[in-house]
């Protein structure tokens, strides 16, 4: 092994295996592009993005870490979201949750 070397298993690496997903349509109603990163709590994204927001509590984009999706003005895209793993506690972002999601999620 070389110092700093990373040895990965052979074959494809699957992300978010076994986690609940949701597909939704998202429209950018604003006049500027909006980019959403892979780990951003989707419920708290820019208000110019129009979608069924209540359904997205506790989810983020189901895309590889470090990537993002860009919504141009007037664009409508279908995206796949995945549940956030862990303790179901969300802090930061736009400060809309700042605590536990338990009891705050709306059923699909």
From Swiss-Prot:
Entry GO MF terms: urease activity
Pathway listed: Nitrogen metabolism; urea degradation; CO(2) and NH(3) from urea (urease route): step 1/1
InterPro entries found in the cross-reference section: Urease_beta-like, Urease_betasu_sf, Urease_subunit
GO cellular component, one term: urease complex
Subcellular location: Cytoplasm
GO annotation terms (biological process): urea catabolic process
Listed SUPFAM superfamilies: Urease, beta-subunit
Entry keyword ATP-binding: no
Keywords: Cytoplasm, Hydrolase
Membership in a protein family: Belongs to the urease beta subunit family.
Subunit structure of this chain's protein: Heterotrimer of UreA (gamma), UreB (beta) and UreC (alpha) subunits. Three heterotrimers associate to form the active enzyme.
Name of this protein: Urease subunit beta
Lineage: Bacteria, Bacillati, Cyanobacteriota, Cyanophyceae, Oscillatoriophycideae
Recorded name of the encoding gene: ureB
């Amino acid at each position: 092994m070389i110092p700093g070397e990373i040895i990965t298993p052979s074959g494809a690496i699957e992300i978010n295996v076994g986690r609940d997903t949701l597909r939704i349509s998202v429209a950018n109603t604003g006049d500027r592009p909006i980019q959403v990163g892979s780990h951003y709590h989707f419920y708290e994204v820019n208000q110019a993005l129009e979608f069924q927001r209540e359904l997205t509590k506790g989810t983020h984009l189901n895309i590889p870490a470090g990537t993002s999706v860009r919504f141009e003005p007037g664009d409508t895209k279908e995206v796949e979201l995945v549940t956030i793993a862990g303790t179901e506690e969300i802090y930061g972002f736009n400060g809309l949750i700042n605590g536990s999601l338990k009891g705050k999620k709306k059923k699909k």
